[in-house]
Curated annotation (Swiss-Prot):
Catalyzes the irreversible NADPH-dependent deamination of GMP to IMP. It functions in the conversion of nucleobase, nucleoside and nucleotide derivatives of G to A nucleotides, and in maintaining the intracellular balance of A and G nucleotides. The lineage of its organism: Bacteria, Bacillati, Bacillota, Bacilli, Lactobacillales. GO terms for biological process: purine nucleotide metabolic process. PROSITE patterns: IMP_DH_GMP_RED. Signal peptide: none annotated. Its EC number is 1.7.1.7. This is GMP reductase. The keyword Iron does not apply. It comes from Lacticaseibacillus casei (strain BL23) (Lactobacillus casei). NADP(+) binds at residues 207-230. Keywords: NADP, Oxidoreductase. The active site is at residue 178. HAMAP family: GMP_reduct_type2. InterPro entries: Aldolase_TIM, GMP_reductase, GuaC_type_2, IMP_DH/GMP_Rdtase_CS, IMP_DH_GMPRt. GO terms for molecular function: GMP reductase activity.
């Protein structure tokens, strides 16, 4: 560990403006090339069961947003890939690392179905079994773009890249409904942005910053410190299109949002590292995505550029430190 490393999180950083070179923020290009495709913004909704389902995946793909389908209905995945291919849309799925997941990859190959993106999605992604799965996918589906995670160190990023991962997902427990940092004492909660920076310096391939993003400005900060894409859960939870269960309390509508390792997800109280919260329902997801794009356009105009590249060069100051990243526990 680098003892001289600066430790900070999103709320601790303010970026310093440069001279603006655009007449209007509408001139700013927020698109990002990630793997073989280009997307409107460098943002992907979290691959969680309370955030994404098949209809939303279709909508996102149709509107040039990146998505990753969750892995909690494994029996649906083959048909989902087939359906997306039929529609002429990108197919992007998640897999775990249990034995039957290795069989599933072979079944995809046997059916001549190659998803555009496959995300190996486990809480502690710096593991031999993840390396085995990367190599397995690359053997059977060599044209799939493989995202592996989650990790929190440069060593992990390098090993997964060397195994064949095309991108890595950085973040151990910084999410709003993730309890890993409190239950285990491990993770990047409270220093997620510094972890992104640390990992990005070692990476040769793209990084997805996953977790801890609480405001739209945090997307720009992630890009500044080396992320190509940001995975976001809580800001997307509670929309009309998101699949979390709706609850009515005193005439107000709320939606359930829970972590992928919560008892609500697992249906069991063993090895729980996630919790459930209720969020007010907040309209259409398209409006939130548009607002994210507009805020990113403004951020680029402050950076003095015309596209996302300009964010990577701005100066910044560290204003304070807070281990809980703005969440009151």
């Amino acid at each position: 560990m680098n003892n001289g490393m600066q430790i900070f999180d999103y709320e601790d950083i303010q970026m310093i403006p440069n001279k603006c070179v655009v007449q209007s923020r509408k001139e700013v290009d927020t698109s990002v090339k990630f793997g073989p495709h280009t997307f409107k913004i460098p943002v992907v909704p979290a691959n969680m069961q309370t955030i994404i389902d098949e209809p939303l995946a279709i909508w996102l793909a149709e509107h040039d947003y990146f998505y990753i389908m969750h892995r909690f209905q494994p029996e649906r995945r083959m048909d989902f890939v087939r359906d997306m291919k039929k529609r002429g849309l990108i197919a992007s799925i998640s897999v775990g690392v249990k034995d039957d997941e290795f069989d599933f990859i072979e079944a995809l190959a046997a059916n001549e179905l190659t998803p555009d993106y496959i995300t190996i999605d486990i809480a502690h992604g710096y593991a031999q079994v993840v390396i085995d799965m990367i190599q397995h996918i690359k053997h059977y589906l060599p044209n799939a773009f493989v995202i592996a995670g989650n990790v929190g160190t440069p060593e992990a990023v390098r090993e997964l890249e060397n195994a064949g991962a095309d991108a890595t997902k950085v973040g151990i427990g910084p999410g709003k409904v993730c309890l890993t940092k409190l239950k285990t004492g491990f993770g990047t909660g409270g220093w997620q942005l510094a972890a992104v920076r640390w990992c990005a310096k070692a990476a040769r391939k793209p990084i997805i910053a996953d977790g801890g993003i609480r405001n739209n400005g945090d997307i720009a900060k992630s890009i500044r410190f080396g992320a190509t894409m940001c995975m976001i859960g809580s800001l997307f939870a509670g929309h009309e299109e998101t699949p979390g269960k709706h609850v009515n309390i005193d005439g107000k509508e709320y939606q359930e949002y829970y972590g992928s390792a919560s008892e609500y997800q697992k249906g069991t109280h063993h090895n729980v590292e996630g919790k459930k919260i209720l969020l007010p329902v907040k309209g259409k997801i398209g409006d939130t995505l548009k607002e994210m794009q507009e805020d990113l356009q403004s951020a680029v105009s402050y950076a003095g550029g015309r596209d996302l590249e300009s964010l990577t060069k701005v100066d910044y100051v560290i204003v304070k430190n807070s281990i809980f990243n703005g969440d009151q526990y």
